[in-house]
Regions:
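Amphipathic alpha-helical polymerization modules
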Residues: 1-130
Length: 130
């Protein structure tokens, strides 16, 4: 592994976790979005992540949730069908919040790896100056 591979790998992790956080923010914003039963439900987005040979990760795309979503009874909703149902996204807030915590922790860990690597590089430069 080269001298700056740690930074390259941590940078790819930061980018992946930022993409994950962005998709979760959108999913959470739409967790209560309902549509008519004849329409497509909001599709949650989940990054598709692949490892990079030599270290790191890359986001290759987004997996979309089920367009059918789930049917919920809400007879007072103006979008409800004759039977009182609307279509909602397949995921709930609890699932999204759990993933949000994981994405935040991953982002924080990648930041810490970057800081530690920079400190190590600075220390090595100081040794070289002596």
């Amino acid at each position: 592994m080269g001298a700056f591979d740690i930074l390259r790998i941590a940078s790819s992790s930061l980018g992946m976790h930022q993409t994950w956080l962005d998709s979760l923010a959108n999913n959470i914003a739409n967790v209560n979005t309902v549509v008519r039963t004849s329409e497509t439900a909001f599709q949650t987005q989940t990054p598709i992540v692949r490892s990079i040979p030599g270290g790191g990760v890359r986001v290759e795309g987004m997996a979309l949730g089920d367009p059918e979503g789930r049917m919920i009874s809400d007879p007072d909703n103006p979008l409800a069908d004759a039977d009182g149902y609307v279509r909602a996204p397949e995921d709930d807030l609890g699932t999204q919040m759990t993933q949000l915590i994981m994405a935040q922790r991953g982002f924080q860990a990648s930041v810490q790896v970057t800081k530690d690597a920079q400190d190590n590089y600075r220390s090595a430069l100081e040794i070289g100056r002596r």
